[in-house]
A protein has these predicted regions:
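Catalytic cores of NTP-dependent nucleotidyl/adenyl transfer enzymes across multiple folds
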Residues: 132-202
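Short connector loops at helix/strand junctions that flank enzyme active sites
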Residues: 56, 70-74, 89, 107, ...
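Short amphipathic alpha-helices in soluble, non-transmembrane regions
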Residues: 89-97
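Short, flexible turn/loop "capping" segments at secondary-structure junctions
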Residues: 20-25, 68-72, 120
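Conserved catalytic core of two-metal-ion nucleotidyltransferases
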Residues: 98-133
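Helical scaffold of the NTase/Pol beta-like nucleotidyltransferase catalytic core
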Residues: 5-59, 182
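Active-site nucleotide-donor binding segment shared across nucleotidyl transfer reactions
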Residues: 47-77, 81-85
């Protein structure tokens, strides 16, 4: 047989894998709520605040921020920087600990991850969304689910259905949730007004 050391050398890095290979390695997992999610978030938030300057707000978003909600075991973090911040400088500061997932044309919309390894998911998996301080939908959606357990239950049901359909197609899974998220976010904004609009001096 192949010795263990040799086997590892043959293993592809994530960069070398096709999208299909990545989806096989990182299928959509839905897990019951883990009470450690907020703790993991706090640990990472502290590290981020110690690493990046000009931070306006750090928030725990996504389903792991809603107690009791079925979710992919990925802690989503929204990092909002002040208007005077330098997005590229922030990205450089994060690159030691985090892997850049997507760069859009807009340097202010960066996604990073942590916990994706060539062997699959690590115990703790994070997505970090870096943006300019703003009135972001994700904060409203999160609060609406937290404050309306029946809506959260409906969302969990939808996720279970979609997981059956899109287990190996992360993009399809995400797109199929969009209508529900949009509708609930619109309701949340009606309820909450401008709860998260930054009150920034120019």
């Amino acid at each position: 047989g192949i010795m263990k050391g040799e086997k590892n050398e043959m293993k592809k890095t994530l960069d070398e894998m096709t999208l299909e290979e990545l989806w096989m390695l990182f299928p959509i997992l839905l897990k019951e709520y883990n009470p450690l999610y907020p703790v993991w978030y706090e640990e990472e938030a502290r590290k981020i605040l110690a690493t990046v300057g000009d931070v306006f707000r750090v928030s725990h978003i996504g389903s792991t921020a809603v107690e009791g909600l079925l979710s992919k075991p990925t802690v989503d973090i929204l990092l909002e920087l002040t208007p005077r911040a330098d997005a590229e400088k922030a990205a450089r500061a994060l690159k030691g600990e985090w892997t850049l997932m997507s760069e859009s044309e807009d340097p202010w919309k960066l996604s990073f991850n942590k916990g994706y390894t060539p062997d699959g998911f690590a115990e703790k998996v994070f997505h970090l969304h870096v943006r300019r301080a703003g009135d972001w939908d994700e904060l409203y959606f999160r609060d609406y689910l937290r404050e309306n357990p029946s809506v959260a239950a409906k969302y969990a049901l939808l996720k279970r259905e979609l997981k059956e359909k899109f287990e190996r197609n992360r993009d399809g899974y995400t797109a199929a949730k969009t209508d529900f998220i949009k509708e609930m976010t619109a309701r949340a904004r009606l309820c909450y007004g401008t709860r998260y609009r930054p009150k920034l001096r120019p």
